[in-house]
Amino acid sequence: MRADLITIQQTLTPEAATVLNQSIAEATRRNHGHTTPLHVAATLLSSSSGYLRQACIKSHPNSSHPLQCRALELCFSVALERLPTTSTTTTTTSSSSSSSPSQTQEPLLSNALTAALKRAQAHQRRGCPEQQQQPLLAVKVELEQLIISILDDPSVSRVMREASFSSPAVKSAIEQSLIGNSVSNSRQTGSPGIINPSAIGFGYRSVPAPVNRNLYLNPRLQQPGVGMQSGMMIQRTDEAKRVIEIMIRTRKRNPVLVGDSEPHILVKEILEKIENGEFSDGALRNFQVIRLEKELVSQLATRLGEISGLVETRIGGGGVVLDLGDLKWLVEHPAANGGAVVEMRKLLERYKGRLCFIGTATCETYLRCQVYYPSMENDWDLQAIPIAAKSSLPAIFPRLGSNNNNNAMLLSNNIISIESISPTRSFQIPMSKMSCCSRCLQSYENDVAKVEKDLTGDNRSVLPQWLQNAKANDDGDKKLTKDQQIVELQKKWNDLCLRLHPNQSVSERIAPSTLSMMKINTRSDITPPGSPVGTDLVLGRPNRGLSSPEKKTREARFGKLGDSFDIDLFKKLLKGLAKSVWWQHDAASSVAAAITECKHGNGKSKGDIWLMFTGPDRAGKSKMASALSDLVSGSQPITISLGSSSRMDDGLNIRGKTALDRFAEAVRRNPFAVIVLEDIDEADILLRNNVKIAIERGRICDSYGREVSLGNVIIILTANSSLGSAKNVASIDETRLESLVNKGWELRLSVCNSSKTRKRKPNWLYSDNDQTKQRKEICFDLNEAAEFDSSSDVTVEHDQEDNGNLVHKLVGLVDDAILFRPVDFDSIKSKTAESLKKRFSNGLADGLTVEIEDDALERIAGAIWLSKISLEEWLEEAMGSSLNSVKSRVSSSEDSVIRIELEDDLNDRISGGYLPSSIRTVVV
């Protein structure tokens, strides 16, 4: 082992060998079995030269307090204490031949330290071309290379992170110092051995070295005064050569130089070479250059014909290189330039092989181009070329005096950690405009403040930074995460406000266009979102005759889902739901979109789907759930009432099971069922909390503590709370309407002369003339006892407010919330009358008139609204025989009127449904 150590020491300079020997002595003192890079780093940090210490201070971005290095020493000391120790073994020489005392065995060099020494030697040879031909032992590793190799060791980097230092930043500081040393030495006008220590950034060691001696710069480029300029010129020449090589390829031959500072300079040099004919023997022979003026670029969408003609006149027998300039014009007006991208692709296809594009862009611009025009890179055959920012050394290390003075260059104190450099640090996710009411806007601002507080660390420790636990230097990632969270918050509160307070700002949010399945596939002029994270998922479908808040619908959603959206499934669901609940077409569209999105993984990661039906249309919500269950699972939904009126599952209550138990049992029996939890706003607090936990965890726990996975069930929560300010639509007494249509009633067709017709206009269903709250008659009977269960109006108002807050919270947890508009019963009656008249007009002569009695129309429309059967199905079933009877009794020449009326004698129906199964025909 001693022989190997001597061999290794021969490859080190005296200073580096001294550090290694001191490290071995430290390992021996601590009774360690191996000498590791941690020992070397600790020795370097405590050495008298202080080279590593000064580099650490210079590399720290916030402060240069000496106690920071003291904290680093403590961290290395703790790390050394954690290393395993070995029992001291002594080796004694032969007592007969030698009288030397026993000595402690020196620790071996660890594999990590051996690898670091080999790295240092390899870097030393690579950095000095004059040493590459020398024997291996002749290459002397200097202290700087030893430090850099030690900093590359993972154990050393980990300890430095614990002390809030960055190994890459320290390495960068050392390397920049080496470059500064070389340039300062090359500028000295005298003996090369006389060097002013003040001209060096830090850690200068008086080691004689030739002027051209440097570890990272080619000695031929280190001529006095021109070293760095020559290096930059050669680097730029290499980049230009790379661009030319791309332009002469057959594929991906249109370069886009991506950089933040100097790509346009490189483009200018390349285009000048092409114009001067410097590529006369290559693929760019006889190529001409067309530079688009800034005004022409800004109007590219409207002046494509002019550009096409210009290319055609200049292309001749060679080709044309079209300079597109800075591509920021593509992202400034993305909607207007969508057609320009397509036309430029056609131009490339027309002159394939003879037309090249070249342009520049910043990192932010190029990323936005990829977001706005996903296919542009393939359509334009683009090849992105990253261009590193180049600055002259005097700009990085400002000189304090002229060349004749002793003051040269000093290292900048702001040395940025390599880990903190991100290619997307200047890219910001565009924020969408908030279009919610003042209440939701205040909630949004509170959430944003919480996010900023968490990310900026307002609750940071009072300890100085050098005594805090190290954190990864991920400022760029934090910024991107913050932007993503803000976009999600914007989407959340815009969406919530749209559903909960629809009329607050509906005029600002209603989209003018209608949803069309053809437009989903063919429309290309929709403005793309500013970011794939910032897409607003607002549900609904605009309807020509409705002013629902869901009119701000689906185009943003379809743009986000893209190819993953199954149009066939959406169309199937929409057709089935809209057929069953045709008066809630917006809600049907929202339900179909939500189910399709969640089925394709764009919702939550769990298999269960949670929807919330809000609004006053109880019958519409029930029919929507039934239609959805029939389309998805082919069966009827399992309905569990959580409110006081348990109408549909009274039989289950007898068995002593709570609603939570019935919910868990339904999931256990069929993990693919559709389960309706009615009146969630009337449930008790325990059940509400269990539902919220089930939404978050994907598992439901019954009253016995047994957990059941929700599997792939679809859970629909219904709430009757009035959300937001509803439209001024006449309210319907659902209970009274149901009791009326549930009584026995029959219809008859009366065929009579037009002069005998009569009209009745009852208005039992509405109270349009009394829009204000009716005054209650107060009548006190002092002989009656007071009712203890009566509640005041104040209590009722608080209960309604609590229910509204509950719904507001649940909307943020479920996958989607669908608002059911108040039922416009006039439109239901109008469509019912239209369908009835159309059915009669198709079967009878044109001269006959069909009239419908108001009472009959109201009962038919109410029964259609409440029953499971559709209007078309009932007409086909009940009207067939009646039409045949009317045809046989009425002549087309007679001036007759066919009236649909209620029977005077109301008897119980045999069918048991809301609608009569047959219609009697009477000729008056």
UniProtKB/Swiss-Prot annotation:
Chain ranges for the short sequence motif EAR as given in the UniProt record: 780-784
Q: Quote the tissue specificity entry.
A: Expressed in seedlings and leaves. Detected in roots and axillary branches.
Check the record and name the SUPFAM superfamilies matching this protein: Double Clp-N motif, P-loop containing nucleoside triphosphate hydrolases
Question: Clp R domain: which residues?
Answer: 8-181
- Entry GO MF terms: ATP binding; ATP hydrolysis activity
User: What outcome is recorded for mutants in which this gene has been deleted?
Assistant: No visible phenotype under continuous red light. Smax1 and smxl2 double mutants have substantial reduction in hypocotyl elongation.
Q: Residue spans with biased composition (Low complexity)? A: 86-105
Induction, as annotated: Up-regulated by karrikins and strigolactone treatments.
- Stretches for region Disordered: 86-107, 522-552
Kindly state which keywords UniProt assigns to this record, in alphabetical order: Repeat, Transcription, Transcription regulation
* Cysteine disulfide partners in this protein: none
Q: Where is this region: Repeat 2?
A: 109-181
Q: Which Pfam families does this UniProt record tie to the protein?
A: AAA_2, NBD_SMAX1
Q: Where do transmembrane segments lie in this chain?
A: none
Which processes are annotated in GO (biological process)? circadian rhythm; response to strigolactone
Q: Which InterPro entries match?
A: ATPase_AAA_core (IPR003959), Clp_N_dom_sf (IPR036628), Clp_R_dom (IPR004176), P-loop_NTPase (IPR027417), SL_signaling_regulator (IPR051650)
Q: Where is this region: Repeat 1?
A: 12-83
PROSITE patterns linked = CLP_R (PS51903)
The text of the family note is: Belongs to the ClpA/ClpB family.
Function of the protein:
Probable component of a transcriptional corepressor complex that acts specifically in the karrikin pathway. Controls seedling growth redundantly with SMAX1, but is not involved in leaf morphology, shoot branching or germination control.
Q: What subunit structure does UniProt give?
A: Interacts probably with TPL/TPR in an EAR-motif dependent manner.
Extract the PANTHER family matched here. CHAPERONE PROTEIN CLPD, CHLOROPLASTIC, PROTEIN SMAX1-LIKE 2
This chain belongs to the protein called: Protein SMAX1-LIKE 2
